[in-house]
């Protein structure tokens, strides 16, 4: 029995030893595979970093290293294939190891006691064997790390200045993508190696060296900008390829022809990568980057083309100005007497041209501004590329639109015509030589008309008018004394009139201005504005004849154009010019296109649908006139109506001072000594009267001496009120002479509208009527006159006042009419109801 047990124990120990040996072999193979995996991507990454750094040196080096890249990529492919094979073998070993483990578990369950001792012994043996194997592994790992370090090239600190950013960016992108693929594998490998090396006595140093090597390789391939300090330190200690920061710092001095060479090299790299099987570098991002670069360059090229076209147009405009100035100088040689004036006018026109060109450019590039009518000239555009450019299309569209608008404005009917007539005796002919020169230059002017039409297109009409006014001002300042106009223009002389018409048709604006300058040099003009209107008239007439729709001999002008020219005209200085026997007279009729006065058309704002209450309605109770359908008027009417009813309503009290009784009512008097309810009623009525009359809410001079008379109708309503007070002085109204007026209505209107005055000499007066009011519906019934009669008899006890002793305070137009009618004269007395001593 013992022999059987010993045999079983030996068998089990042999089985365990074999399983341990196999497990150790699989672990060794896994570690070697992981190292192979690490070395493979490291070599590829370092070769890529090396190629990216060396590709920035020169073009020949790039071409030589293209082959190295392809060879290295092929070696990488082989390494990946071997790794795949190793993984397959590892899977087979792992399956066998799992089966053996299951068999070991079964044996352990069968004899647990024997297995415990064997396990203890096997663990010790395993530790001894593992120590020796780990030392061998660590030596192998160290050797591989040193080989990797030696394979790295030394850092090249000096690089050429013609490196470029585009190749750097593409290489960095590919490296980053590879690093992302490698990171997953490298992390697992690092964990395995660290777990194996930790237990060994020399493991810490090797671990640190291995980690630093991996970190250096990964950071060099990524070219990270976030940690420049770490990369510089590693450059000092270890030979690491140059980082992307150093490369970017040396990208400033880039040359244009080398860009094209680098592009070609990049395209070749893409082609080689696509041909290789299982290449890790994708070619799609490089193509997209190149497309983006090409699009950006095309945009820049279009912008540069626009700038060149604008610059060429400006230069061509300046050339035209110089040509036209030279043509003007040739004309000046024929007329030596006009050289000084011509030079000044040409210089000013050139300045205006520059200003107008600047305005045109501002209007083109800033559409928010109001566009002016400007004609575009296409100068020196010969190539098909320029003709098809956006800038020329914009100019052509604007030119066509402006021309269309001007044709429409010419076709439109003209509202008014101005006649320019020259008085026959006003102009005398003393210099026939100037007339011959004027007629002789006609043929020469015909030849120059085509050239001067360009100047018309550049300059606007407003600039032309301003130029003419400046020229006129200069000529009037330099005009000699005791001289007359050179030419005699008479409407009765038909041949000369025809010559003038022909000259208007053939000559351009500047030729006509030159002729008038030659006239104005020898003529004093008293009215500068008249001459300027003549020039502007002739100028705009010739401008109208440019278009086919206008008549050939039309010398009329719209009045609004002359008003525009007079507004834009500079204010001339006041020069004292001598009076001459003959002067220029221009008769201009009034403008036919005057703005008519805005008629106050009574618009019907409310629909008349046959309702009873429509339009203005007057209330029978309060007498207010309001619009029935207007809510605002209705609310105002309600307020006034309620106030009027409450104020006018008279209940009556016990002690009434009845002064007189009439069939339509009675008159009562209220004194300050009366009860409070009576005084309260008087105050309420006085407030209503003040609002109706528009009086100031001012206290009376002496409330204790006032007397109030009320006219109460039979229906117990207060329809009249009179407030009187004691005064000392009054002032006589000054009566004005009335014009001859036939009807009484006109007389009443005149009395109401005219202003009235009073004298400053005071006259004695006793009774002053502060307020007198009668309800509007009860007027023309002698209510006011009856109240004054009662006042005259009851104001002072035992005496009857005369009309000369009564004064009125600041009467309204109706009150003034009543006072004149009651007193029988317009020279009645007035006083200030606030202060009885002073006049109004």
Curated annotation (Swiss-Prot):
Catalytic activity: L-lysyl-[protein] + acetyl-CoA = N(6)-acetyl-L-lysyl-[protein] + CoA + H(+)
EC number: 2.3.1.-
Tissue expression summary: Widely expressed. Expressed in heart, brain, liver, placenta, lung, kidney and pancreas. Highly expressed in muscle.
Effect in UniProt of substituting residue 803 to A: Strongly reduced autoacetylation
Main subcellular location of this protein, as a coarse class: nucleus
An example molecular function term from Gene Ontology annotations: identical protein binding
Domain statement: The N-terminal region seems to be responsible for association with chromosomes, thus excluding any involvement of the Zn finger in this process.
PANTHER family from the UniProt entry: N-ACETYLTRANSFERASE ECO, N-ACETYLTRANSFERASE ESCO1
Listed name of the protein: N-acetyltransferase ESCO1
Species of provenance: Homo sapiens
